[in-house]
């Protein structure tokens, strides 16, 4: 009898494996990648999903099956910020299946990443909105978009994607992202929940979401810098106390009134004091190029000079750029200026994404990942110069409240050395939700070391810091990131 049961179980497991092989679109399967000579630890797929066939409007994705158990592990959508930056940024530089070793020639060597998030999850890297990365439309009007349209389009993508990959419809589904994805993630989550209420098919088995160093609310984000710079020892006690006094403890008000003249003066002093630091990780060196003319330097916004050029251990990342609201400014309603608009006519310091740019513009790579040729849709850019983007959804606080009160789990994580979207803002708004503290502030551990600190709230909300990390947390702390990511997805205590 026991052998019969074992045989039945084995047959079921075999049929599940066969289902995955059979159901996934064969045309999307990636069979090789230039630069990688080994065996993929799991299946990779890439291609386009038409979200509007009449307009030939298409979103491009790269899907990595879990290396553990694809049939039951969560499916996670990853979104980079910008707005308008490709999620292949996360694939190449943060938590994708490969580490990229740049070569002096045009080729790159790819090595397996021991801390890839595909170790424990199926993960979709999506170029969104249309006009970003390899995503495109035949109608240029589609390159004028906003938060609301982006959320709707991405929801349409998900519905179509799960039809293409029906074997994953029952898997737990999570949405994740960083920086301006602090807007993308909750607005998309709200669309998914709305789809549940409208009984939209297929039903997405949505369980929760993760946001890293995400822009959220203009007042909370705007008030984060001064306490961050003081807490990090970047400004003096005297300057902090003087600024706090003349500003009445409020450094950004939003709306039309603004702050007093005296407060504005002190805030400028704070800004000037930290001006030469690396905006995206204050521990990293900041490269100040010598190629700029005196005229360029005079007219460039000072904060541009804080865009850091860093040397990582793998020597892949040469700078930190384009992950957040331009220049690290507060997210305000209205049109978001693109980098190309801000920098028209000027030399740009500290910008070097040669690894991702060269690799993804290699015709052999584009063919391997089923992307359109350059002559059809143009070259791949880390952050698109094609978009006109409008922020139209306001504060994310109510989105988070509605989602968490509806039973969806939320992890708000912050690299504690990011000055672009400081952890102080995220800590403040999560506290201001008013939920009961159910897990008092404490250290969390990775590899038997303190990796940061966390505080848990009622209604499924967790705030987490990552010690020593900058704006793109998995890039700086890959092992620690995989640890908190794995625990959160599994519903375990971090």
From Swiss-Prot:
Residues of the active site: 179, 418, 471
Name of protein: Serine carboxypeptidase-like 21
The gene is SCPL21
Please name the InterPro entries in this protein's record: AB_hydrolase_fold, Peptidase_S10, Ser_caboxypep_his_AS, Ser_caboxypep_ser_AS
Per the UniProt entry, what is one GO biological process?
A: proteolysis
Q: Which family does it belong to?
A: Belongs to the peptidase S10 family.
Q: Mind giving the lineage of the organism this protein is from? A: Eukaryota, Viridiplantae, Streptophyta, Embryophyta, Tracheophyta
Q: Which GO terms describe its cellular component?
A: extracellular region
Q: Which Gene3D superfamilies match?
A: 3.40.50.12670, alpha/beta hydrolase
| Stated role | Probable carboxypeptidase.
Q: Name one GO molecular function term.
A: serine-type carboxypeptidase activity
Keyword set, alphabetical order: Carboxypeptidase, Disulfide bond, Glycoprotein, Hydrolase, Protease, Secreted, Signal
Q: Please name every pair of cysteines joined by a disulfide bond in this record.
A: 85-383, 247-263, 286-350
Localization, UniProt: Secreted
Q: Name one Pfam family in it.
A: Peptidase_S10
**Signal sequence residues:** 1-23
PROSITE patterns, per database record: CARBOXYPEPT_SER_HIS (PS00560), CARBOXYPEPT_SER_SER (PS00131)
Known EC number(s)? 3.4.16.-
**Enzyme class, UniProt record, top EC level:** hydrolase
Glycosylation sites noted in the Swiss-Prot or TrEMBL record:
37, 69, 198, 248, 402, 460
Q: In which tissues is it expressed?
A: Expressed in flowers and siliques.
Is Signal a UniProt keyword of this protein?
yes
């Amino acid at each position: 009898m026991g052998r019969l049961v074992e045989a039945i179980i084995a047959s079921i497991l075999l049929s599940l494996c066969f289902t995955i092989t059979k159901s996934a679109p064969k045309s999307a399967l990636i069979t090789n990648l230039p630069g990688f000579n080994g065996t993929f630890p799991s299946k990779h797929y890439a291609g386009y999903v038409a979200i509007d066939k009449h307009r030939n409007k298409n979103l491009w994705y790269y899907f990595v099956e879990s290396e553990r158990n694809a049939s039951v592990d969560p499916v996670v959508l990853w979104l980079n910020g910008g707005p308008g930056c490709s999620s292949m940024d996360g694939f190449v530089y943060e938590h994708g299946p490969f580490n990229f070793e740049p070569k002096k020639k045009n080729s790159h060597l790819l090595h397996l990443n021991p801390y890839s998030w595909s170790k424990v999850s199926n993960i979709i890297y999506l170029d969104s909105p249309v006009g970003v990365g390899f995503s495109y439309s035949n109608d240029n009007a589609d390159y004028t978009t906003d938060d609301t349209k982006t959320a709707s389009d991405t929801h349409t993508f998900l519905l179509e994607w799960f039809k293409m990959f029906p074997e994953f419809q029952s898997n737990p589904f999570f949405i994740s992202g960083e920086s301006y994805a602090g807007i993308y993630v909750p607005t998309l989550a709200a669309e998914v929940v709305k789809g549940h209420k409208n009984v939209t098919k297929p039903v997405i088995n949505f369980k929760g979401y993760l946001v890293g160093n995400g822009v959220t609310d203009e007042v909370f984000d705007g008030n984060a810098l001064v306490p961050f710079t003081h807490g990090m020892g970047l400004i003096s006690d005297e300057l902090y106390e003087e600024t706090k006094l003349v500003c009445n403890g409020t450094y950004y008000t939003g709306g039309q009134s603004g702050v007093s003249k005296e407060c504005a003066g002190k805030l400028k002093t704070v800004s000037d004091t930290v001006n030469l630091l690396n905006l995206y990780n204050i521990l990293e060196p900041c490269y100040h190029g010598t190629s700029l003319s005196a005229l360029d330097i005079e007219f460039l916004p000072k904060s541009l000079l804080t865009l850091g050029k860093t040397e990582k251990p793998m020597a892949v990342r040469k700078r930190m750029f384009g992950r957040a609201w331009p220049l690290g400014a507060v997210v305000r309603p209205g049109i978001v200026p693109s980098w190309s608009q801000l920098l028209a006519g000027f030399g740009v310091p500290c910008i070097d994404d040669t690894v991702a740019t060269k690799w993804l513009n290699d015709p052999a790579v584009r063919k391997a990942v089923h992307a359109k040729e350059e002559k059809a849709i143009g070259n791949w850019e880390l952050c698109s110069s094609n978009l006109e983007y409008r922020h139209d959804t306001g504060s994310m606080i109510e989105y988070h409240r509605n989602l968490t009160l509806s039973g969806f789990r939320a992890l708000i994580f912050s690299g504690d050395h990011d000055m672009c979207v400081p952890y102080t803002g995220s800590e403040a708004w999560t506290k201001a939700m008013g939920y009961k503290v159910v897990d008092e502030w404490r250290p969390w551990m990775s590899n038997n070391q303190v990796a940061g600190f966390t505080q848990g709230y009622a209604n499924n909300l967790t705030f987490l810091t990552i010690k020593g990390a900058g704006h793109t947390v998995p890039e700086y702390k890959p092992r620690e990131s995989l640890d908190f990511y794995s625990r959160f997805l599994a519903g375990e205590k971090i």
